[in-house]
């Protein structure tokens, strides 16, 4: 039997075991393959099993492929706008950003040290502006049930300098980590906020990598941390948007 003689549903099921990128390439081969490759059967498999949690009535009329592209092209704000979710278009892997409001930041509600501000280039309503602290501590947690299985993830602190610049970070290294809360072993790295470790992002913000973590098939909680609590030197002048968690292979 010729492959193209198979029922469209069967072809769609086979295509669903490839990747979103491959499905788009297959759809360009012929009209029959395009119909199968663009079908809800194919794209249902590329969507997260819990995707219905992230959509409202305005998205309910979308086809599965349209939903997938919507998740990839425009991050969704959930949990009262404190968390951002999207998917990587080529692989369909899940990506997240926890806003500053979602993080545990020491002294963040003390206006002499931190202030909450709104700026136009943030995806969240509020970001945390650091005035000055001697104890710099930011922590966040996420369940691996929200991440893609069998995937190596990295976490990044997303920030920018205030207009007058930052201070105190030049000579004080930050201790950063990305680890399971089950382990008692702290494999912290030291990085400098103002050095070659920071990277510019397409959205105009900066980021530093906190670490890597392989997400297997067990559900557990993982923690991200950024600390400078040893030296006690005063530091300030940055704006924290949040912590982003995305697959390591995405550059």
Curated annotation (Swiss-Prot):
<dbReference type="InterPro" id="IPR025886">
    <property type="entry name" value="PP2-like"/>
</dbReference>
<dbReference type="InterPro" id="IPR036047">
    <property type="entry name" value="F-box-like_dom_sf"/>
</dbReference>
<feature type="domain" description="F-box">
    <location>
        <begin position="1"/>
        <end position="46"/>
    </location>
</feature>
<dbReference type="GO" id="GO:0030246">
    <property type="term" value="F:carbohydrate binding"/>
</dbReference>
<dbReference type="InterPro" id="IPR001810">
    <property type="entry name" value="F-box_dom"/>
</dbReference>
<dbReference type="Pfam" id="PF00646">
    <property type="entry name" value="F-box"/>
</dbReference>
<protein>
    <recommendedName>
        <fullName>Putative F-box protein PP2-B12</fullName>
    </recommendedName>
</protein>
<dbReference type="Pfam" id="PF14299">
    <property type="entry name" value="PP2"/>
</dbReference>
């Amino acid at each position: 039997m010729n492959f193209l003689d198979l029922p469209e549903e069967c072809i769609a099921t086979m295509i669903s075991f490839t990747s979103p990128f491959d499905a788009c390439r297959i759809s360009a081969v012929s009209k029959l393959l395009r119909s199968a490759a663009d079908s809800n059967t194919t794209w249902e498999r590329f969507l997260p099993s819990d995707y219905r949690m992230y959509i409202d009535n305005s998205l309910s009329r979308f086809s599965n492929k349209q939903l997938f592209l919507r998740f990839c092209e425009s991050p969704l704000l959930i949990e009262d706008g404190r968390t951002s979710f999207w998917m990587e278009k080529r692989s369909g892997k899940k990506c997240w950003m926890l806003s500053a409001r979602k993080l545990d930041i020491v002294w963040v509600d003390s206006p002499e040290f931190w202030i909450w501000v709104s700026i136009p280039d943030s995806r969240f309503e509020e970001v945390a502006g650091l005035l000055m602290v001697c104890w710099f501590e930011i922590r966040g947690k996420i369940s691996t049930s929200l991440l893609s299985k069998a995937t190596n993830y990295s976490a990044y602190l997303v920030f920018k300098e205030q207009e007058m610049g930052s201070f105190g970070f030049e000579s004080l290294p930050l201790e950063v980590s990305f680890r399971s809360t089950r382990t008692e072993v702290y494999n912290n790295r030291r990085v400098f906020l103002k050095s070659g470790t920071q990277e510019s992002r397409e959205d105009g913000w900066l980021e530093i990598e906190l670490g890597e973590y392989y997400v297997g098939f067990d559900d557990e909680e993982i923690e991200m941390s950024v600390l400078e609590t040893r030296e006690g030197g005063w530091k300030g002048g940055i704006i924290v948007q949040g912590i982003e968690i995305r697959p390591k292979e995405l550059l």
